[in-house]
């Protein structure tokens, strides 16, 4: 295992990138290009609802999908997750050789410090999507990215978000961990990510992104991805 806060002591071959709530694998387009340039094979699947529909989909349903996918990938392998995807990555960290958490929803006890929200059984982000509100939510993105995101937001399971907000107990991962915190994240306060990183003795990368999704969809997404790729596969 790498020393705390140091780059991983192996060259990661593959990486599974797990998107956040209401999004999809498309969110990782910039990261995919960068990782491939660094010789890292990437998978960016969409999380799928359960057979009983989105309203019945649970956090465990998503965890099962992530575990099946990461187990199929050659080692050394990394799990990379953003927002809810970060929490899912934490829950599957036993299958990874390195873990990257981008503005992750934190596990308990830090989850208690998240802003409280009420979630319906199906969160209608697709139905209620508006280009203007999309642009406001990602001020660091260019117009083309904002338009693409507006057209691709999806509805989400309220049960998954309620479980995450209530707090999920996760032990400190045995693998190397890199946490990324946006300076102006209004959804997951950057200090929460910093506190998690300190407790887990993980490396903390603070980025100037102006939103929760900035490290993936902002103009600096490729630069952030390059820093991560160098940490995963030091040359």
Predicted regions and their residues:
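Active-site glycine-rich loops that stabilize anionic/oxyanionic intermediates
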Residues: 20-24, 83, 183-184
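Serine-hydrolase catalytic-loop signature spanning alpha/beta hydrolases and amidase-signature enzymes
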Residues: 22-30, 42
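Conserved alpha/beta-hydrolase
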Residues: 35-54
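Gly/Ala-rich beta-loop-alpha elbow adjacent to hydrolase catalytic centers
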Residues: 80-85, 89
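Flexible "cap/lid" loop of the alpha/beta hydrolase fold
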Residues: 94-125, 157-167
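Short beta-strand/loop motif that positions the catalytic acidic residue
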Residues: 173, 179-181
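Conserved alpha/beta-hydrolase "acid-adjacent" motif
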Residues: 186-195
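Catalytic histidine-centered segment of alpha/beta-hydrolase-like enzymes
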Residues: 210-223
């Amino acid at each position: 295992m790498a020393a705390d806060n140091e780059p991983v002591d192996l060259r990661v071959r593959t990486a599974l990138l797990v998107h956040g709530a209401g999004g999809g694998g498309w969110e990782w387009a910039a990261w995919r290009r960068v990782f491939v340039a660094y010789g890292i094979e990437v998978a960016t699947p969409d999380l799928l609802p359960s057979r009983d529909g989105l309203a019945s989909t649970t956090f465990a349903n998503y965890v099962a999908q992530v575990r099946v996918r990461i187990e199929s990938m050659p080692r050394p392998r990394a799990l990379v997750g953003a927002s809810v995807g970060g929490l899912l990555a934490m829950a599957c960290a036993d299958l990874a050789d390195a873990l990257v958490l981008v503005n992750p929803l934190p596990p308990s006890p830090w989850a208690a410090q998240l802003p409280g929200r009420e979630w319906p059984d199906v969160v209608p982000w697709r139905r209620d999507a508006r280009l203007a509100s999309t642009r406001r939510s990602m001020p660091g993105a260019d117009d083309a990215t904002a338009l693409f995101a507006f057209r691709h937001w999806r509805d989400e399971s309220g049960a998954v978000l309620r479980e995450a907000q209530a707090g999920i107990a996760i032990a400190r991962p045995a693998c190397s961990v890199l946490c990324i915190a946006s300076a102006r994240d209004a959804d997951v306060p950057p200090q929460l990510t910093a506190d998690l990183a300190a407790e887990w003795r993980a490396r903390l990368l603070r980025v100037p992104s102006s939103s929760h999704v900035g490290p993936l969809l902002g103009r600096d997404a490729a630069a952030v991805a390059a820093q991560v790729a160098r940490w995963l596969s030091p040359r």
